[in-house]
Design a protein with these regions (language model features):
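Residue-level recognition of tetratricopeptide repeat
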Residues: 87, 112, 141, 179-186, ...
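Single-residue signature of alpha-solenoid repeat helices
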Residues: 98, 123, 152, 198, ...
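Beta/coil-rich, acidic/histidine-enriched accessory regions frequently appended to metallopeptidases
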Residues: 28-69, 73-77, 82-88, 112, ...
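Zn2+-dependent metallopeptidase catalytic core
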Residues: 41-82, 90-93, 147, 397, ...
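Juxtacatalytic substrate-recognition/specificity segment
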Residues: 155, 194, 200-205, 235-236, ...
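Amphipathic alpha-helical substructures
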Residues: 341-344, 404, 409-412, 558, ...
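Residue-level detector of the short coil/turn that links helix A to helix B
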Residues: 93, 118, 147, 193, ...
Length: 911
């Protein structure tokens, strides 16, 4: 009978848990942000002035109709004439609409559509005799795209003359004039001198002539974007969209900004919006938006998905075979496939259409730079700059590329030229300042490293780095069976601001070290304003050096997750508890990333925990690969990546399974591995609590009512009810000490139950551990070996004991804590002092040394390390720490006196 009851109870528990899990999943689904996913992005609210202008009583019906079309709030009946339909089609990005075949459509609109389609010669021919400022601007734009720069510049002369004579009172003419001046700035290399003038013209157009002329805001956004001022560009483009929600050009610029910020969800939504604008156009072919294809392709290239980029572009190019932006991006996709011959063939086809245009070369170089193909990228960017020396973008990309590749002189030349052309370019300006800063730095060298540092106190750390760096090289190069062909440069940046500029060209960044291949930049581990704080730089640089070696071995063609996984794996340190908790949470809630999601999570996380999970899960998968397929498997994968083989093909070749099967097998293994951590234990604590809850009639009824209410709420949310989203927590019985003791009798050393027992014991002592608790704490530490809490408590108990033998027992627990500590010297210094008490001098010196590696500018730790070294009779180590103290505290003469005595002792020993 008891067995029957137990089986029935298990069944009921399982069924109830199924209901709970299903409801939780439903709640998660219905409570997701409606802005997420792959749907299109809603437009900003229509500006109040637009609606008032459309409804103004002094406009007749035809004028109101024209207003609705101009502001993109038309209904299909408003597109009653070819001219109005053509204007709406241009805005929506439907460049091949049938309206453009009608002669009654203004010649400028027909020519503009040709310009967008890439029919440049035809546009120029059509505009023969047209004298409007817009017509002349379109002619100049077509000539520029053809690479006929002198003719393009000459075509702008009439526009400049008209605007200089102040012969226009139309907002459209001023805005078209600015567009023409933007072309001239690219052609002549004078964007700096004209920038303020162009901004003034736009301000006059929108503030004085027509406050609702939305193209003024769009062109302002384009001008700001050219200067790398994405924040203000985004504000301007949103203003334009509030006055014309159907402006495809505005949406496309917003998409470019999203891609630049690696906001791939936003880019996807904007691309969907562009497709929606095109497909919703009356009687338009349902072929999507060419501008949407550009946004999608650029996003996929940034995600190192050239096949996806090519797929996004091919339909558009079938529809518009001479569309220059599409052709340029398609060549870039071919290059990122590492098919350089194919890319060159596409570049030749582009050059046949536009012999002097640098656009395709620039896009190829830019994409390859993003993919860290530095040598090939530099070649294409150099060719682009040669075709149009006055156009800053190729020079900007080249300068930033050379900076990341560690070729300072080449970076200086490119960025200096950019500064001459365009001092308003933010990234280039910051990076040029960085180069000029780096030129003042000093260096120290070893066999495999160059350490570059700002003169002054940073020398203390820089000179000490070489020996640990060579140890790092031995470990990493040995494990990866590869040695880079050149010395790796470690740039010790003096503070967080300079570090941010070093790795991104912008001063805001949230990390402490980064590798770009042959260069590793790190922030000095200091405390104070503009510093991130102290950290275990040896572990951090070991991680970054793995990137340097894997990138070198794979020719910079390794998937993002895989290089991060190798780097964490070769740090050689155990996981911290928070990482274990994060992984187990993802595992038990079916939230582990698939092979596509894990790469994106590094650079554009959707949740605050995504980036940390990507690091942790990648490391876990790397461990699985080594355990199941052997230590050579990761190296074989790297060799295939070096040959240009993509992950989708490489994994089956080496591992014998497809990526989806790999994730399934890894997940099954992960459950087993997590159990060895004392986590993902079965039965779970929730299951035990639920089982106990179901034994109580009143609690069982309350749980049922709660689930029913939650089901109703979830259904209402799914139906669009405006309820506040919340996390569901079932009403379960509270665990008591007798109940936990009973469970421990049934389930042995269950880690969750032991953790509860520790909590009960601490509650009795106001949170202070006692000697009476040590057995329980040791049991919990053994049951859940990844949790540092029992070790902290045991260390505290033993360190507080008067008995020396008990104090000695603190050491293994402090060692456990220290090996996991990354940002504080507390445990290392405590161990050093404890070992000094025990007269374990060599151990004390080792731990004091580790403390100074985490906090190299802490004078008190230097004194501790010098003392331990002297007791260990290691005079050279003592000399080093005393010399550091002289630099750190120059006003304390005692350091110089001690250093002098140690130097004398070394001399006496013949050193």
């Amino acid at each position: 009978m008891m067995r029957l009851l137990r089986n029935r109870s298990t069944f009921v528990v399982g069924a109830t848990l199924l209901a709970f899990t299903g409801m939780a999943a439903l709640a998660q689904t219905v409570q997701e942000d409606p802005r997420g996913g792959s749907g299109s992005l809603p437009a900003p609210p229509l500006a109040e002035g637009v609606q008032r202008a459309i409804d103004a009583p002094y406009f007749d019906a035809d004028e109101k109709q024209e207003r609705r079309v101009f502001h993109g709030v038309w209904a299909p009946r408003d597109l009653s004439s070819p001219a109005l339909r053509a204007k709406a089609a241009l805005d929506a990005g439907v460049w091949d609409d049938r309206a453009f075949a009608h002669d009654e459509v203004p010649v400028e609109d027909r020519a503009d559509a040709m310009l967008q389609r890439g029919e440049l010669e035809e546009a120029i021919e059509l505009l023969a005799g047209a004298s409007s400022i817009r017509a002349q601007r379109i002619r100049a734009a077509a000539l520029e795209q053809l690479g006929r720069f002198e003719e393009a510049d000459a075509a702008i002369d009439p526009i400049a003359n008209a605007l200089l004579r102040n012969q226009t009172t139309e907002a459209e003419d001023l805005v078209e004039g600015v567009r023409a001046f933007m072309i001239r700035a690219r052609l002549r290399g004078e964007p700096a001198s004209n920038y303020q003038e162009m901004m003034s013209l736009l301000a006059r157009a929108r503030d004085e002539l027509d406050r609702l002329y939305w193209p003024a805001y769009l062109v302002e956004a384009e001008l700001l974007y050219d200067k790398d001022n994405s924040r203000e560009a985004r504000a301007a483009v949103m203003q334009a969209l509030s006055m014309n929600p159907r402006s495809a050009a505005a949406w496309e610029l917003l998409g470019q900004i999203a891609v630049d910020g690696f906001n791939m969800d936003g880019a996807s939504q904007i691309a969907a919006k562009l497709d929606e604008l095109a497909s919703d156009f009356p009687n338009a072919p349902e072929l999507g938006s060419p501008l949407g294809a550009i946004v999608t392709a650029r996003a996929r290239l940034r995600q190192n998905d050239p096949d996806g980029a090519a797929e996004a572009l091919d339909d558009t190019l079938g529809r518009f075979p001479t569309y220059r932006a599409g052709l340029a991006m398609r060549a870039a996709a071919q290059a990122v496939r590492y098919d350089f011959a194919g890319a060159d063939e596409r570049l030749a086809q582009f050059a046949a259409l536009s012999p002097g245009s640098p656009l395709a070369l620039y896009e190829v170089g830019r994409a390859l730079s993003e993919a860290r193909q530095y040598e090939q990228s530099a070649r294409y960017l150099e060719e682009a700059a040669a075709l149009q020396p006055n156009w800053p973008p190729p020079l900007v990309e080249r300068g930033l590329l050379e900076l990341q590749a560690g070729r300072d002189q080449e970076a200086l030349e490119a960025l200096t030229r950019v500064a001459e052309l365009d001092p308003f370019q933010v990234r280039a300006r910051n990076s040029l300042a960085l180069i000029q800063e780096l030129l003042t730095y000093e260096t120290v060298e070893s066999d495999h490293f160059i350490v570059r540092f700002r003169p002054g106190v940073d020398r203390v750390m820089a000179e000490e780095m070489l020996a640990p760096l060579e140890e790092i090289h031995s470990i990493v190069a040995g494990a990866l069976d590869h040695e880079p062909s050149r010395k790796t440069t470690i740039e010790l940046m003096p503070d967080h601001r300079w570090f941010g500029v070093r790795i991104t060209g912008m001063p805001a960044i949230h990390t402490i070290a980064a590798a770009t291949g042959p260069v590793i930049a790190m922030e000095a581990p200091k405390i104070g304003p503009n510093h991130t704080g102290e950290y275990d730089w040896v572990r951090v640089i070991r991680h970054e050096y793995v990137h340097t070696v894997t990138l070198s071995r794979t020719k910079n063609r390794i998937p993002h997750w895989f290089t991060e996984a190798a780097a964490v794996y070769l740090e050689g340190a155990p996981r911290d508890y928070s990482t274990c908790q994060l992984l187990v949470s993802a595992l038990t809630t079916d939230q582990l990333f698939d092979m596509d999601e894990i790469n994106i999570a590094f650079v554009r996380p959707k949740k605050p925990t995504d980036r940390a999970q990507a690091y942790a899960q990648g490391h876990w998968m790397y461990e699985y690969i080594v355990e199941r397929f052997g230590e050579e498997a990761p190296l074989k994968l790297m060799d295939l990546y070096a040959d240009g083989v993509r992950e989708r093909e490489a994994m089956p070749s080496v591992l014998g399974i497809e990526r989806d099967e790999f994730i399934r097998d890894f997940t099954a293994w992960a459950w087993e591995d997590a159990a060895t951590w004392g986590m993902a234990t079965r039965p779970s604590l929730d299951a035990l609590l639920l089982e106990e809850t179901l034994r109580d009639d009143a609690m069982r009824m309350a749980l049922r009512e709660s689930l029913e209410a939650f089901a109703v709420e979830a259904s209402m949310l799914a139906g669009g009810a405006g309820l506040e989203r919340r996390t569901y927590s079932p009403p379960l019985i509270a665990p008591t000490e007798p109940l936990v003791d009973e469970w421990l009798m049934r389930h042995g050393e269950h880690p969750d139950l032991l953790e509860l027992s520790v909590g009960f014991a601490l509650r009795e002592t106001d949170g202070e551990p006692t000697l009476a608790m040590t057995d329980l704490l040791e049991r919990y530490a053994n049951a859940r070996p990844v949790d540092p809490a029992p070790h902290r408590l045991l260390a505290k108990v033993y360190l507080g004991a008067e008995d020396p033998d008990l104090r000695d027992r603190a050491a293994p627990h402090l060692e456990y804590l220290d090996v996991r500590e990354q940002t504080s010297p507390t445990f290392a210094s405590a161990l050093a002092r404890l070992y000094l008490e025990e007269r374990a001098i060599e151990l004390a010196s080792t731990k004091a040394e580790r403390a100074t590696q985490i906090a190299p500018f802490d004078a008190s730790l230097r004194e501790l390390a010098a003392r331990a070294a002297l007791l260990d009779r290691d005079l050279l180590r003592a000399q080093r720490h005393l010399a550091a103290l002289v630099e750190l505290e120059p006003d304390r003469s005692i350091h110089a006196d001690r250093l002098e005595r140690v130097n004398a002792m070394i001399q006496e020993q013949g050193g």
